[in-house]
Amino acid sequence: MVASIRSGVLTLLHTACGAGILAMPYAFKPFGLIPGVIMIVLCGACAMQSLFIQARVAKYVPQGRASFSALTRLINPNLGIVFDLAIAIKCFGVGVSYMIVVGDLMPQIMSVWTRNAWLLNRNVQISLIMLFFVAPLSFLKKLNSLRYASMVAISSVAYLCVLVLLHYVAPSDEILRLKGRISYLLPPQSHDLNVLNTLPIFVFAYTCHHNMFSIINEQRSSRFEHVMKIPLIAISLALILYIAIGCAGYLTFGDNIIGNIIMLYPQAVSSTIGRIAIVLLVMLAFPLQCHPARASIHQILQHFAEENVSISATSADEPTVATESSPLIRDSSLDLNEVIEEESIYQPKETPLRGKSFIVITCSILVASYLVAISVSSLARVLAIVGATGSTSISFILPGLFGYKLIGTEHKTAVPLTTKIFKYTGLLLFIWGLIIMITCLTAALKLN
């Protein structure tokens, strides 16, 4: 099934707007209102340019077969497994955090209608949601199949946006009593919170790059002029949502804001619906994390399988020098074609990731996510470290590297100005990604 631009926009927007949208007002606390808005715009521009670069470099592999693995192997085959591992860890960690959110909110939601201790147990709620909703959606092979789920999730985000705006425009007396000091410029920095603590919220608010190649592969055309519309629309909408929720939430509570804004609203029908909306959002977002994680795990397993085959072939060819070189050259070229051809999730029509492999990897992700989610109530620090490494790698470092190394290589003489701009913007994104990785790791390790 060929995907449309609209379904691509919905999928990308849904991937970007996860549960982190609830923390956007909190991100303003050490920055102040105006610097906070500037950070949202700056990080949005960086994310959009990174997605544009992904759209540009997709042409360097056969149409419908673009992926991080295929492109990484064009630059340096040895780096492929490193970035596949980063994607798998990042997506798995975010998926687990979604289930932890379900475990935190579902008992609060159910308490409105029942006092049954079994139904108010967080592990029971995680089990039910995983079994009846998350697992079936995670077995879908194409992102386009999740377009209706994405529509529901985006509707949930829209409701949250309206809820935050309404409470800002017409606050209750209880909310007014919670209001703290508002800073329009940088406020005085405190020991327990500074800009490094909330910087990752801005930087990773637009992380959706791990699904960009899947979306490109499912489009009827991979031409840049066609594909660029998807990140342009999706990131623009995300930017509007983040500014609306971030500004309204911060102006409502000032420096008394907390990490999950909806927890500050008094018990009411509107806030209960808001909690349900959050559960819908994260529940439907889990498959969007499972999708690239599954592909990356498959690539890692395939890498080791190919390595074993290569070692066996080398051992078999050792007796003669004449047969030692030519088979290895042929194997090398075949390996590259196989890598591009076997992009599991990124090429659904000709994927080897089906049957037993597809089921085993998907079940492993689901079971591991479930076990971690019911065992741990907070992954804040771990996810901060995973985000600083995995998210930065796939959002800035790797796309930037692709852009700088690949864009313009098709030109033998003069390189057009537009191509040069994309090429060197890739280098800037690569450097930006390294700076952000170091900064956010410092924040996660020393300031939390």
From Swiss-Prot:
The chain crosses the membrane at residues 8-28, 33-53, 81-101, 126-146, 151-171, 196-216, 230-250, 268-288, 358-378, 382-402, 425-445. It is a multi-pass membrane protein. It holds the Pfam family Aa_trans. Keywords: Amino-acid transport, Membrane, Phosphoprotein, Transmembrane, Transmembrane helix, Transport, Vacuole. Belongs to the amino acid/polyamine transporter 2 family. This is Vacuolar amino acid transporter 6. It comes from the Eukaryota. InterPro entries: AA_transpt_TM. It is found in: Vacuole membrane. It comes from Saccharomyces cerevisiae (strain ATCC 204508 / S288c) (Baker's yeast). The modification Phosphoserine is found at residue 344. Residues 29-32, 102-125, 172-195, 251-267, 379-381, 446-448 are vacuolar. Residues 1-7, 54-80, 147-150, 217-229, 289-357, 403-424 are cytoplasmic. Involved in amino acid efflux from the vacuole to the cytoplasm. Capable of transporting aspartate and glutamate. Requires ATP for function. GO terms for biological process: amino acid transmembrane export from vacuole; amino acid transmembrane transport; transmembrane transport. One of its GO terms (molecular function) is L-lysine transmembrane transporter activity. The keyword Transmembrane applies. GO terms for cellular component: fungal-type vacuole; fungal-type vacuole membrane.
